[in-house]
């Protein structure tokens, strides 16, 4: 029964090495958040679809930071992006505050295209941990500067204000266009409708001044899935410095599952987890058609100590409860599909996920 629920009976996948890696992070997404979304979608008032059930390999991740049992998003994401434990509040630096090279940066250095897609500000802790290096996650304008210079080919999310309304009066988006040739867009609709840009032109679309609006506040439930498909389409070609079709690395974050947990708002958590499931569906659709793409889903930590206590399976009456408004040390799920997916079938430290991904690409960890 469990195998059927979670997709373990699906087509055989998992051996070999991937050309592309799509890393999906559900910020604050523990097993209970996944369970609630599954029950609602398949047995409650949902439409019955469940994309996370299409994964073929499953594991657990330990999320502790270097200085605490309970991590924050900066330390948790830095562990995933660099394979090193660091202190809470850090992004892309180690306990000694020195920069650590991320898997995104290593991908770019070896001729792969790179991208990030998030529902928070791109300067927030998780995306910052993949392409910035700062001792304090709250240094948003400094992080924006790092991102403007990072080896990114595709950057979509919120946080426009940190690039254009700055204390130093600089307009980083203009600089990215003039100095690095970025195609700058400010509406998701324009990005989705735009013809594919040239292989040598990177894209930045900061489509919200701050974070994306909540699903309950009007964000299109299909937007993130559509942007995921667009990201795969845009990145799936040789990088400008590559001599062959060397693949891509794409990090996607469902950022606001965490915020629902902090607010102890079960409906918020459920809506954002279901949104991430649609993102998973778009990524897996690409991976299945492509045949050379590894998709990994995990979390930086769990938020809220969420439990399902009673009630029905629909969002309005499911008995969702919380033990805290903060993060917890609960282990989080790891799910994978595609070449190399078998490497994710383990109970492992979050730093090990990075090491195994590097191994699949023959990168020095």
Report each predicted region and the residues it spans.
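Active-site regions of oxyanion-processing enzymes, predominantly non-cytosolic
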Residues: 191-205, 227-255
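Active-site His/acidic residue clusters
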Residues: 125-130, 209-216, 231-232, 243-279
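N-terminal catalytic scaffold of extracellular/periplasmic and nuclease hydrolases
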Residues: 13-166, 172-196, 200-201, 302-365
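Bacterial N-terminal signal peptides
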Residues: 1-5
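Gly-rich Lys/Arg/Thr-decorated short loops/hinges at beta-loop-alpha junctions or inter-strand turns
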Residues: 80-88, 204-216, 258-264, 335-337
């Amino acid at each position: 029964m469990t195998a059927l629920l979670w997709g373990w009976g699906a087509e055989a996948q998992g051996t070999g090495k991937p050309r592309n890696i799509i890393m999906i992070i559900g910020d604050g997404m523990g097993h209970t958040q996944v369970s609630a979304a599954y029950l609602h979608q398949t047995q409650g008032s949902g439409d019955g679809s469940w994309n996370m059930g299409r994964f073929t390999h499953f594991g657990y991740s330990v999320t502790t930071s270097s200085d605490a049992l309970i991590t924050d998003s900066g330390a948790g994401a830095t562990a995933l992006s660099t394979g090193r434990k660091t202190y809470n509040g850090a992004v892309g630096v180690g306990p000694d505050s020195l920069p650590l090279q991320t898997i995104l940066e290593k991908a770019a250095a070896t001729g792969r295209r790179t991208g990030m897609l998030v529902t928070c500000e791109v300067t927030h802790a998780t995306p910052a941990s993949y392409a910035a290096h700062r001792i304090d996650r709250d240094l948003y304008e400094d992080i924006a500067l790092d991102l403007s210079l990072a080896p990114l080919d595709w950057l979509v999310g919120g946080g426009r204000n940190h690039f254009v309304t700055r204390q130093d009066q600089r307009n980083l988006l203009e600089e990215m266009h003039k100095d690095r040739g970025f195609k700058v867009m400010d509406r998701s609709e324009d990005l989705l409708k735009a013809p594919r840009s040239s292989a040598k032109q990177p894209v930045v679309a900061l489509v919200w001044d701050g974070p994306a609006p909540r699903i309950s506040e009007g964000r299109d439930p299909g937007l993130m899935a559509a942007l995921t498909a667009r990201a795969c389409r845009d990145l799936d070609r040789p990088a400008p410095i590559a001599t062959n079709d060397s693949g891509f690395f794409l990090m996607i974050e469902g950022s606001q599952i965490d915020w629902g947990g902090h607010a102890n708002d079960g409906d918020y958590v459920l809506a954002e987890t279901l949104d991430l499931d649609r993102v998973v569906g778009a990524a897996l659709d690409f991976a299945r058609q492509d045949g050379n793409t590894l998709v990994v889903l995990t979390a930086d930590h769990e938020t809220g100590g969420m439990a399902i206590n009673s009630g029905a399976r629909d969002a309005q009456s499911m008995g969702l409860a919380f033990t805290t408004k903060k993060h917890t040390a609960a282990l989080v799920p790891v799910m994978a599909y595609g070449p190399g997916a078998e490497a994710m079938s383990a109970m492992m430290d979050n730093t090990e996920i990075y090491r195994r991904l590097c191994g699949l690409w023959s990168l020095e960890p």
